[in-house]
From Swiss-Prot:
Low complexity bias locations: 849-865
Protein name: Protein translocase subunit SecA
Function: Part of the Sec protein translocase complex. Interacts with the SecYEG preprotein conducting channel. Has a central role in coupling the hydrolysis of ATP to the transfer of proteins into and across the cell membrane, serving both as a receptor for the preprotein-SecB complex and as an ATP-driven molecular motor driving the stepwise translocation of polypeptide chains across the membrane.
Annotated source species: Dichelobacter nodosus (strain VCS1703A)
GO CC term (a single one): plasma membrane
Catalysis: reaction(s): ATP + H2O + cellular proteinSide 1 = ADP + phosphate + cellular proteinSide 2
Polar residues bias spans: 866-876
Key word Metal-binding present: yes
Amino acid sequence: MLGKIIAKLFGSRNERIIKQLSKTVKKINALEESMIALDDAALRAKTDEFRKRLTEGETLDDVLPEAFAVVREAAKRVLGLRHYDVQLIGGMVLHQGKIAEMRTGEGKTLVATLAVYLNALSGEGVHVVTVNDYLAKRDGGELGKLYSFLGLTTGIIVSGMDTEEKKAAYRADITYGTNSEFGFDYLRTNMALSPDQRLQRKLNFAIVDEVDSILIDEARTPLIISGPAEMNTELYRKLNELVPYLTLQKKDPNQEKRSLLNDEEEIETGDFSIDEKTKQVGLTEMGHAHIEKLLVEKGLIAENESLYEPKNIGLFHHLNACLRAHHLYHRDVDYIVKDGQVMIVDEFTGRTLAGRRWSDGLHQAIEIKEGVTVQQESQTLASITYQNFFRMYEKLSGMTGTADTEAYEFQDIYNLETVVIPTNRPIARIDYTDMIFLKQSGKYQAIVAEVKECLARRQPVLLGTASIETSELISDLLTKEGVAHNVLNAKQHAREAEIVANAGLPGQITIATNMAGRGTDIVLGGSLKAELDKLGADATEEEKAAVQEAWQKRHDEVIAAGGLHVIGAERHESRRIDNQLRGRSGRQGDPGSSRFYVALDDNLVRIFAGDRMAGMMERLGMGENDVIESKMVSRQIEGAQRKVEAHNFDARKHLLEYDDVANEQRKVIYNQRSVIMDAENIREMLDEMRESIVTRLITHYVPADQVRQNWEVAGLEAALLNEFGLSIAVEKEWLAKEPDLSVDEIQKRLLAAFNAIDAQKRAQYGDDMMDWAGKYVALQIIDELWKGHLATMDMLRQAIWLRSRAQKDPKREYQRESYELFIDLLANIQLQIVRLLNHITFNAPNAESTATAAEPAPEASQSQSTNDATASQNPPITEVEASKVGRNQPCPCGSGKKYKHCCGKL
């Protein structure tokens, strides 16, 4: 109540921000006449003037009014477009590192040019992030003309480019690209083996287009560069054959009530249960016993073994994936099968996600289910989430048509404030109340009837669905009624530009899966620009005028019919996606309308609002084809959407809390790699590593606080020989001859022995060769051990929830154990680097191509959206034969302990 009173007196925070920025708009407008008076060369010279002023101590805010005025005038000359006042406000919001919410058709692409130009003046680079390659090419190409006119360079990053092309694009003042390519290139940059292999510069400033799609919808999708891993395809096939024998648990609501009233234990009636909200599967006690029996029959486990024994965890993992594949992931909803491949469908945009694969064996399980070729499982070499990648930019901002519903999440996770920018013209779209049906069959009949009504008055219709399955079902119904229409979904994405360009034609019916992120406005009367482009450069003015006249007639006809009518065939889980669909109509003050159709057996209502609502309507006598327009029911449906949004927000925040732990470790590792790569040589670093290893050897085997009888001298000698190739008779040569030899003296002699090996190799092969080998070995070892650490962290994260059974906080336990693992990793990196360099030999002096060893550091292959193996420019180093001891074998020192608990503990 108090907040409302304050808002009435002083205006909301959003209104105050707009009012404050409007003062700067007046300054920019006052400069317009002086900019018009400048010729092209003088306008271009302003860029150099601004850069000079910045070097002399002025800030970007100081030059903002004049810089924005320059961009506005340049856009008029190059693009034929003039920034509106509200677009200037949007540009300032982006420059301030905030999110600008601008309605569809308000010119977000043009708004970005203001903040892009201003921030590019610093010379530190600006990244403009789009949702697909098409938009990156389109915007980078068209707006690149504007930036070039003003003396700035523009680069475009798309998948499939070679390293040199990407390096050039990143060194441009402004770089356009997709969110995934920027993220993958960050990982590739930090997997480089030499400075000239790096792609990116410092992450300075990014403007994210469709920011809600990338930072919220994609937040739980990790970017992973992976290499091949071992996989047992036959195991998946055998487990897949078991699925039909397992029954899904169906709960009896009456039994549930009796259990609650009588405090009785609920009787389980199936082998497994599913949770459609979280897409997870759980085994019942009955199912556990049944599955073990089936596994014994298949010969997958022994007679008396349990599914939960450590060695069978892999079986359980694969079986879980098979059950999820059959019962929670559906063809033409979650994925499509095309050209013998299972392709994921983005639930928010309806696009296929080329190159993306589900993890945890799920993708392989779906491939088995669909009978297509099973592709190899992968092992993570490097990964990062979008959340942590974009938070690394010094300044981040974004644009979207629908951010206000997620404003709290943007503020809480990314520290980004959302500012709603006023529209240039008032919105004329009419949003009708939802039409609510008992069953989907009645809903679809009503949708077809409304489409036919619109067609009769030649009003274009955009019919939005949440899945390919629904889009094809409605398409079949319209075909039976003889209604011509276009379908835009993941299966027809090749015709996307053509379908969207024609969606505003009189009487045009377009069915589309989620239109979020399509990036192209639906123009009433069709796309005039597309028609003029078809004429080509040789077209006469008369031909252009004829096309313009024909378009104007169609445009007026559509406006007379009521503009674009949007029909939502179902409510999406997120209100934001519904708003994006609505926003396709009524652009730039055009007329339009929207209406959603909801059935009480739609997935959203059924899963999150329960059967209570449907039961109540049936008792009131509502039939399948009856329809109601009830604000109460609509509020309940919105309540269900809020539940889903809250659930998804919690999931994203939970993921971030865990990923933050890995992110801090990632920063340390990548910084260490960067220091090694940039150093002329790492002799000092290697000296410190040898000293650290000797200290650990002493502490472990001959600790100063223990009497000599408790020292493990044999273990020390074995570790020196097996790990580092040092044959030192500590007992016979040192301690037997010098009984009073101190621990400090032993430490000095051991360090001298390590340094002697390095000196010997430098004398033999030369400093240059050993300096190169030191850097190369260090980078390879870091990459190899980091890869294993990522796998261990992933397993820890999957299992850590079990700590809650012991009344422990899983998050704290994860933080504690991951820290211990990381300390072990850093120690092991030092050990392996020194160990390998002690054993390294070269067949010929100063011939880097002839280095040999016994354990080659594996070459990193990168695969996700592409399988672009980054081959090292230097030859792989292999290691000389040294004695090998298995981790679980008895330690050769004779202690009687396992090697991993003795000499291998280092």
